[in-house]
Amino acid sequence: MAVVTMRQLLESGVHFGHQTRRWNPKMKRFIFTERNGIYIIDLRQTLDYIEKAYDFVRGTVAEGGSILFVGTKKQAQEAIAEQATRVGQPYVNHRWLGGMLTNFQTVYKRLQRMKELEALGDLSGTAAGYTKKETLQLSREKEKLSRTLGGLRDMQKLPAAIWVVDTKKEHIAVDEARKLGIPVIAVLDTNCDPDEVDYPIPGNDDAIRSAELLTKVVAAAVADGLIARSGRRRGTDEKPEAGVASDEPLAEWERELLEEPKKSDEPKSDEQPAAAAAE
C-alpha cells in the first residue's frame, strides 16, 4: 500500500505551486503545467520522491538516528510541533537561532539552563531564596528559553537529518545542515532551489493542509523506523497511510494528473516566467 495517495495530495493542495512570475527555473522538471498563472506540480514525481524520503527516514531512525523537524512559518508551526512530539523527535517551530546546529554545544548548555529553571517549579510567586525581582527575571528567562528551545529539550546530539517546510524561509537551518553534512529532507515549492536538498518532495509549502500531510508522512516514516529499531515486526511490508482520502469528485484538470501526461502540458524548454495577477 502506498505511503500516501494521489487523491490525498490533491485534496491537500500539494500540487499548487507559486505564481509563474515567482519561480526558480531549476524547478522546471517538477512542473506539470500552468493554470491561471499558477504552476501545477507534477504529483507523480511527488509520489516517487515521497517514497524515497520515507525509506531514507525510516532507515535512518531504525539505525538510531533522529530527525529534527523545522518549520517556523505560521502554516507549519502546529503540524511540526504535533507530529514531532507524536514520534518523540526534536523540533523548531518558532524562530531559528543561528548556530542551533553549528554551535550545538552552546545550545546544549542553554537547554541545561532551561531544565534548571524548570526544576525550580512555579515561578509565578516568589521562589525560595530569591527576591521578587529575581523571581520575575528567572520567570522571563525560563519563558524565553522554553519558547525558543522547548522543542529541543531532549536532543542530546546533532540530528541524523532534518525535515524542513519552506527552505527559503529556513535557509539558515538548511545552510547549517549542509555545512555539517547533515542530510536535508524538504518540501520543494516552485520557487525553491532543489540543489540545496538531499531528499526533495516537490509540493506546496504554503498551504496548512499540505504542510500537515507531508509532515505527517515524515512522522509516519519515523514511527516505522522506531518500530524497526525496537526489533518488533509489523507483520507486513505495507507502509502506513498518512490519512484517509474521501470520495469527492475531482475537477477535470485535476483528473489529468491521474492520467498519462500529454506533451502539450509539459513545460517548454524556452518558457519564460509569465506575469500573473497579484495573490
From Swiss-Prot:
Give UniProt keywords alphabetically: Ribonucleoprotein, Ribosomal protein
A Pfam family for this UniProt protein?
Answer: Ribosomal_S2
Q: Which is one GO molecular function term here?
A: structural constituent of ribosome
Where do the TM regions start and end? none
Span list, region Disordered: 232-279
Top-level taxon of the source organism? Bacteria
Q: Name one GO cellular component term.
A: cytosolic small ribosomal subunit
Biased-composition ranges for Basic and acidic residues? 252-271
Might you name a Gene Ontology BP term for this protein?
Answer: translation
InterPro entries linked to this entry: Ribosomal_uS2, Ribosomal_uS2_bac/mit/plastid, Ribosomal_uS2_CS, Ribosomal_uS2_flav_dom_sf
Q: Which family does it belong to?
A: Belongs to the universal ribosomal protein uS2 family.
What is the official name of this protein in its record? Small ribosomal subunit protein uS2
Which lineage is the organism of this entry classified under, starting from the top rank? Bacteria, Bacillati, Actinomycetota, Actinomycetes, Micromonosporales
Query: Gene encoding this polypeptide?
Result: rpsB
